[in-house]
């Protein structure tokens, strides 16, 4: 997990907005992290993946798929996944498949479910890497929903957590906020 070091407590936000308890008790939020001028979705993803691979001691070549879930594009023609391949290339891995799932709050869920399905459907023992990264920067009325963070997860067979079916989906063309 990577969260930026710049934070604002939700107690401060409640005081500013005159709504004591709304964010801390109502939304169970303690603080909001914000990116510094030298941070973006790519740098957070690179940091989270580097740390996770180091701590897990998984061989880079054991990852056969990289799926990113985000709503924070940094380049409209280049995926965050392609930036992450820089780390894998440094370890001789150039063939990890996968894509970015660009879809508001569902992007990370889609990346996870796609990876679970890939692990189940393939005859390989390789794992999938799921990276969920976002930077929310909403208008002043919705500032309590702002924030930034990244999580990297490994998905593989015989994992300590199992994702079971059935699944339900409901999609509509709507404005979230």
Regions found by a protein language model. Give the residues of each.
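Buried hydrophobic positions in well-ordered alpha/beta secondary-structure cores of metabolic enzymes
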Residues: 52, 63-66, 111, 154
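Beta-strand segments within the central parallel beta-sheet cores of soluble alpha/beta enzyme folds
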Residues: 61-69, 96-100, 125-133, 164-167
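Acidic, glycine-rich active-site loops and adjacent beta-strand->loop/helix elements
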Residues: 2, 69-75, 102-108, 132-137, ...
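Short, contiguous clusters of charged residues that form electrostatic/catalytic patches at enzyme active sites
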Residues: 43-51, 110-113
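Phosphate/pyrophosphate-binding loops at sites that engage ATP/ADP/AMP, CoA/4′-phosphopantetheine
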Residues: 21, 48-64
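Conserved catalytic cysteine-centered active-site region
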Residues: 24-26, 31-40, 72-127
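Condensing-enzyme catalytic core mediating Claisen C-C bond formation in acyl metabolism
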Residues: 1-41, 144-177
